[in-house]
Amino acid sequence: MVREKVTVSTRTLQWKCVESRTDSKRLYYGRFILSPLMKGQADTIGIAMRRALLGEIEGTCITRVKSEKVPHEYSTITGIQESVHEILMNLKEIILRSNLYGTSDASICVKGPGSVTAQDIILPPYVEIVDNTQHIASLTEPIDFCIGLQIERNRGYLIKTPHNFQDGSYPIDAVFMPVRNANHSIHSYGNGNEKQEILFLEIWTNGSLTPKEALHEASRNLIDLFIPFLHMEEDNLYLQDNQHTVPLSPFTFHDKLAKLIKNKKKIALKSIFIDQSELPSRIYNCLKMSNIYTLLDLLNNSQEDLMKIEHFRSEDVKRILGILEKYFVIDLAKNKF
């Protein structure tokens, strides 16, 4: 466990981690402070951040099991101690970490007798298990235990519905939330009009993300939500005669690029996030895993740097170069200077 003495800055607003610990492979804890804040700001930020931590961060789960030998979810199989329903519940608890986009397939094929655990899951290379010891089933006889799995990356909850049931395929209620819990508290100091606040934020995660990673992801998601309001056309800010609404033009990546070309000084490159571009989601996820979130981050890398990214291909670099050349009339350096 790591603890740091809390010191309050009287100048620049800043985040700081004051405590972090790993309780288990599936439970991480972090405590952060943000200061100095004006009166009322801590609650505003704390509420928004807690919502983003619990609802906006994506996670990876097993969402479906496939086996033609299982008649129904509540049946039992000779040679297996657990019922099918119990096995599904155990698979629901498996914690995965990935840069997967959408769905992917995995499988388990084990011969008994013995215990089946998370380490027996055969996964694609871009998915990893947080805790290999998680129990799935106990095989009491020399039988073959072979099932297919569907893995999905999403956010929030996925509740199985009747139309999701297929012959030999069983959906699992999935909880995609990497953050188990988040709380915020406020400490006030100072007197009168000079009163200020410190925001304390506590984050518990399931091990697929660290609290610091979760905080970064939630912050970026909040920024993405608010950017459209910063860059809408000025003409749309004023009501015309006989109008009772303010028309907001649809926010697109291309609109922002066009405005940047006209006057690069007005919009910082760091305010353009790559997930708003026309890049395929697979390319975006690869960039994100390398901490490339904005156009500024991208331009700070060479073609050679991009080719070193895991699962990145030459076609992906060409796709990025095409966008940069089309909308910025610039090229990405082949090598670092």
UniProtKB/Swiss-Prot annotation:
One of its GO terms (cellular component) is mitochondrion. It is found in: Plastid, Chloroplast. GO terms for molecular function: DNA binding; DNA-directed RNA polymerase activity; protein dimerization activity. SMART domains: RPOLD. Residues 10-233 are annotated as: Alpha N-terminal domain (alpha-NTD). In plastids the minimal PEP RNA polymerase catalytic core is composed of four subunits: alpha, beta, beta', and beta''. When a (nuclear-encoded) sigma factor is associated with the core the holoenzyme is formed, which can initiate transcription. NCBIfam families: rpoA. The N-terminal domain is essential for RNAP assembly and basal transcription, whereas the C-terminal domain is involved in interaction with transcriptional regulators and with upstream promoter elements. It is an enzyme of class 2 (transferase). One of its GO terms (biological process) is DNA-templated transcription. DNA-dependent RNA polymerase catalyzes the transcription of DNA into RNA using the four ribonucleoside triphosphates as substrates. Residues 265-337 are annotated as: Alpha C-terminal domain (alpha-CTD). Its EC number is 2.7.7.6. InterPro entries: DNA-dir_RNA_pol_insert (IPR011262), DNA-dir_RNA_pol_RpoA/D/Rpb3 (IPR011263), DNA-dir_RpoA (IPR011773), RBP11-like (IPR036603), RNAP_asu_C (IPR011260), RNApol_insert_sf (IPR036643). Belongs to the RNA polymerase alpha chain family. It comes from Nicotiana tabacum (Common tobacco). It catalyses: RNA(n) + a ribonucleoside 5'-triphosphate = RNA(n+1) + diphosphate. This is DNA-directed RNA polymerase subunit alpha. Its main location: plastid. Pfam families: RNA_pol_A_bac (PF01000), RNA_pol_A_CTD (PF03118), RNA_pol_L (PF01193). Keywords: Chloroplast, DNA-directed RNA polymerase, Nucleotidyltransferase, Plastid, Transcription, Transferase.
